[in-house]
Amino acid sequence: ITCPQVTQSLAPCVPYLISG
């Protein structure tokens, strides 16, 4: 799983995963 930016937790990653 790759996220644009992971800071502290997966909070910024959640909308990214939903988007695809």
From Swiss-Prot:
<keyword id="KW-0929">Antimicrobial</keyword>
<comment type="subunit">
    <text>Homodimer.</text>
</comment>
<keyword id="KW-0446">Lipid-binding</keyword>
<comment type="function">
    <text>Plant non-specific lipid-transfer proteins transfer phospholipids as well as galactolipids across membranes. May play a role in wax or cutin deposition in the cell walls of expanding epidermal cells and certain secretory tissues. Binds 1-pyrenedodecanoic fatty acid. Has antifungal activity against P.digitatum (IC(50)=7.5 uM), A.alternata (IC(50)=1.5 uM), R.stolonifer (IC(50)=8.44 uM) and M.grisea (IC(50)=2.19 uM). Has no antibacterial activity.</text>
</comment>
<dbReference type="GO" id="GO:0031640">
    <property type="term" value="P:killing of cells of another organism"/>
</dbReference>
<keyword id="KW-0295">Fungicide</keyword>
<protein>
    <recommendedName>
        <fullName>Non-specific lipid-transfer protein PHP</fullName>
    </recommendedName>
</protein>
<dbReference type="GO" id="GO:0050832">
    <property type="term" value="P:defense response to fungus"/>
</dbReference>
<keyword id="KW-0813">Transport</keyword>
<dbReference type="GO" id="GO:0008289">
    <property type="term" value="F:lipid binding"/>
</dbReference>
<comment type="similarity">
    <text>Belongs to the plant LTP family.</text>
</comment>
